[in-house]
């Protein structure tokens, strides 16, 4: 079976999973961040691990959609930004867990997240 055909046939499933993953991931990130900042390290770690599962779901569904879009540069750049966002999220959560100043990373997460969402809704186009 041609994997490109499989992805094309199931594109709406990948898209719905991807969109849902983003929404849940944003919530999980904020919950984990504030749990760490509030000194609830164990609960924060559990939520952080669940967020990592959603990182994987988001990456797999995003890569599948990128294949379906035949690696169009707009979506390729959006994917690179998403990988950077994951890095910023991990850095922000790590700093929050260690009780270090994490406001810079939190700001980076929010800025990149807003850019990616605006790209997703077609407000930012190039």
Curated annotation (Swiss-Prot):
Signal peptide: none annotated. The chain crosses the membrane at residues 16-36, 43-63, 66-86, 104-124. InterPro entries: UPF0344 (IPR010899). It is a multi-pass membrane protein. It comes from the Bacteria. This is UPF0344 protein ABC2900. Keywords: Cell membrane, Membrane, Transmembrane, Transmembrane helix.
